[in-house]
Amino acid sequence: MNADWLHAIEEKLTRLKDRGSFRQLVPTSEAALPWLTRENCRLLNLASNNYLGIADSKEFIERTEQLASSYAIGSTASRLIIGNHPLYEEAEYELTKWKKTEAALIFGSGYMANVGIISSIVGRGDAVFSDKLNHASIVDGCQLSRADHLRFRHNDMDHLETLLQKSPHKQKLIVVDALFSMDGDHANLHDLVTLKERYGAILMVDEAHSGGVYGATGGGLVEELGLNDRVDIQMGTFSKALGSYGGYVAGAKPFIEYLLNHARSLIFTTALPPYIVASHLAALQIVQEQPWRREKVQVLGERLRNGLEQLGFSLCGSESYIVPVLIGDNHDLLLVSESLQAAGIAAIPVRPPTVPRGEGRIRLTVTASHTEKDIDWAIEQFQRLPLVGRRELTP
């Protein structure tokens, strides 16, 4: 074993600990439920991306098992070899109907989808215009593409237009999260569509955190705003509101065929197991049949936001069921997290580099499995915190 190498790693770990940025895995049970178990403590689960409460639904599990009953556990190969089992075609057909596009393609994960899409459609001599707060998978896709990576200030359409005006690039790709995972606010999709049409760009929207919850059928923010025909690429995941695992992209048929021949993160990996793809089908059915789930999570999200705002907490401009409580300094953040977990809330600290330095936060998420009583109790626990991360309110 190379002792110098290990010593260098240990020094880096020590620096992480000194900054309060060291991370560890913590065994967690019942993570799909409203209350979970972590380090032998029962905690209110405000840390899950299971927004619609589907992952723990008995109906979801039963439908999935029925659809997958005649298949083996493993897919045995990549999709382009023999791993493209019939459930893939069924699920992708349902995706095209749901997203109102010509075609769709399922990837192994949302991360793999973003990396594969972006690195396939742009390259040297092209440019990607990316919101500063886009997910790491988008950033990594931009870097792998070798295109010029031009980041615009968060939701700043004037800055984006300035960059587009100055761009000499032939191929221009604009990519944004529809709902930003660490701030809980929305992209300005109407303005983005206008700019992409004005400057001849391609627009890619990542619906990872909005898919399933927004729109008449849960199709996402693009559907809710009626922009299906004007957004070129709709990407999303099955791992959040849809309660399963995997990523997807929907768009024009030639584009999907192009990805099938160029996206390395699809071509050079084993296909998802049939059971997982069966769960995609089951989730798509439930999302469209049960609108009460998305209605409930929106109402509960508003209830939590209102309660915390009244206590003086900064919520990063959240307008959704993702409710980040801004604390700031890492050490203060860890103290708040420990206090909340001692009170009975799974309050997971989010630190740099996931968020900008000095903007550490407790990222709270609401699901349709929660009750009003759960939310009100959580607000009470925040009220008991010392004045860290919130302003003092005048009477």
Swiss-Prot record:
Catalytic activities: 6-carboxyhexanoyl-[ACP] + L-alanine + H(+) = (8S)-8-amino-7-oxononanoate + holo-[ACP] + CO2
Purpose: Catalyzes the decarboxylative condensation of pimeloyl-[acyl-carrier protein] and L-alanine to produce 8-amino-7-oxononanoate (AON), [acyl-carrier protein], and carbon dioxide.
Gene: bioF
Family (UniProt): Belongs to the class-II pyridoxal-phosphate-dependent aminotransferase family. BioF subfamily.
Binding-site positions, pyridoxal 5'-phosphate: 110-111, 181, 206-209, 237-240
One Gene Ontology MF term: 8-amino-7-oxononanoate synthase activity
Keywords carried by this UniProt record: Biotin biosynthesis, Pyridoxal phosphate, Transferase
Alphabetical list of PROSITE patterns matching this protein: AA_TRANSFER_CLASS_2 (PS00599)
Record bears the keyword Transferase: yes
PTM annotation (N6-(pyridoxal phosphate)lysine): residues: 240
Entry-linked Gene3D superfamilies: Aspartate Aminotransferase, domain 1 (3.90.1150.10), Type I PLP-dependent aspartate aminotransferase-like (Major domain) (3.40.640.10)
Coiled-coil regions listed: none
One GO term (biological process): biotin biosynthetic process
Identification of the protein by name: Putative 8-amino-7-oxononanoate synthase
SUPFAM superfamilies for the chain: PLP-dependent transferases
Provenance organism: Halalkalibacterium halodurans (strain ATCC BAA-125 / DSM 18197 / FERM 7344 / JCM 9153 / C-125)
Residues binding substrate, per UniProt: 23, 135, 354
Biological pathway: Cofactor biosynthesis; biotin biosynthesis
